[in-house]
Amino acid sequence: HLSMNTNGGAQDVEWWKELAIIMGRKGHVTFSFDGLGDTNHLYRQGVNWENCMKNSAAFISKGGRARWEFIIFDHNQHQIEEARELAKKMRFDDFRTKKTGRFFSTVKHEGKESHQGMNRKGQETQKLEKPKDEYINNALKQEKNLVNKYGSMDHYYDVTDINCKSIEKSEIFVTAEGHVFPCCWLGGQQYKWYWKPKEAPIWNMIKDPNNINAIYNELKDIIEGNFFNMIENSWS
């Protein structure tokens, strides 16, 4: 089964129609639409809403299986049901809301009330505010209890058991460059705006990106290779 996540703003309708035919019913595309025409661009910087609608409709028109995934913020929480109805009208197979973990600082390892968006140049863009409590990620609600029990989040990370979702579901993540990772969370560590190129800690494990590139290697060799083993060994 092949799945692809996209903001839906790139390419033209003919490209999306062709993709639907190529994927058939054995795969699906998750369109990350976080709001409607007046709000989606606040998080999806530079994405044109009309293109999103045309491209997703074109994909569905040729039998493509489409899922609408909606990340909830303060600025779009009032649009959830309207977006759900639009997804039904457009014949999306599924509509899912996502309670984001973005209101947790991965630098300070603590919760925060807002999240300052940045572009690739490190410039501030949209400031994202937390939604209502019912839309807060459940894991974020456990922070205070975990700190009280373990003393700090760092100590909790050191002693907690890790249940790898990718192992449980037999999944892998392939970047647009062809790099193979267990999941998108690790793949996304390559290019954080606050790290200079190839200075993020994940590069200490990657070393030569060609070694984990599916263009040059068999998937089996990558999955059974040093990079995946190093990740698993780091848990103990």
Residues covered by each model-derived region:
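Radical SAM enzyme [4Fe-4S]-AdoMet core and its adjacent flexible, acidic
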Residues: 18-217, 221, 229-230
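Active-site metal-binding loops of divalent metal-dependent hydrolases
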Residues: 8-9, 35
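Short His-Asn-centered micro-motif
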Residues: 6-7, 168
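Immediate flanking context of iron-sulfur cluster ligation sites
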Residues: 226-236
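Conserved Radical SAM active-site core
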Residues: 1-3, 9-25
